[in-house]
């Protein structure tokens, strides 16, 4: 989870940002259709064996496009990552999912991710595979937030860190403001929304 070094505009630094990410407008929705089509084309996921896992990834990409909005086209690949890392993004449109989880059967992958969640490491969700994809997509979105919005996320993060009554988040969200944002957006997609997830959504666009 989390971002590596890098940046740029879209795939390999040469992609295109969403011209209008506002999902409440017809222009914004049409733009998301274009970005989703490009993302699916760039993400054949040939090295993922179980079609159910592949379908979960594609569904996560589509639901994120419809609910949050892709900031640009995304290429999703599966490859080996360090032990314990579920995924990574370079901040420039490329997302890597760890084959240690995603190359397994859907049943085994979901069990391992669910066990991680039950151990208190990640947000509570009923779709752990999709939640991992949503988390990495949220890192890409965070990289495009304005400075003022990142400051607002930081302020919300400080409030969250002092909240002793919060439930369903897990330890990873406490790492820093960006991980808090990514976990919160993921939780808002397939978990139970709360005041923090709702506030993060309002800060997104």
Language-model features and meaning:
Residues 1-14, 182:
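Non-Sec secretion/translocation targeting segments of pathogen effectors
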Residues 15-205:
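Active-site-flanking segments in enzyme catalytic domains
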């Amino acid at each position: 989870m989390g971002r590596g070094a890098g940046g740029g505009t879209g795939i390999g630094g040469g992609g295109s940002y969403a011209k209008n990410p506002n999902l409440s407008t017809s222009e914004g929705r049409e733009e998301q259709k274009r970005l989703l089509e490009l993302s699916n084309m760039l993400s054949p996921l040939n090295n993922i064996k179980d079609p159910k896992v592949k379908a979960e990834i594609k569904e996560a990409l589509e639901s994120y496009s419809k609910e949050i909005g892709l900031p640009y086209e995304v290429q999703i690949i599966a490859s080996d990552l360090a032990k314990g890392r579920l995924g990574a993004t370079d901040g420039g449109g490329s997302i890597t999912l760890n084959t240690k989880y995603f190359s397994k059967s859907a049943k085994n992958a979901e069990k391992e991710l669910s066990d991680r969640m039950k151990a208190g490491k990640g947000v509570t969700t009923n779709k752990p595979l999709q939640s991992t994809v949503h988390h990495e997509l949220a890192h890409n979105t965070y990289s495009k937030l304005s400075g003022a919005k990142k400051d607002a996320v930081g302020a919300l993060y400080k409030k969250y860190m002092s909240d002793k009554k919060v439930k369903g988040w897990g330890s990873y969200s406490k790492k820093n403001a960006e991980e808090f944002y990514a976990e919160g957006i993921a939780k808002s997609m397939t978990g139970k929304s709360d005041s923090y997830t709702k506030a993060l959504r309002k800060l997104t666009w």
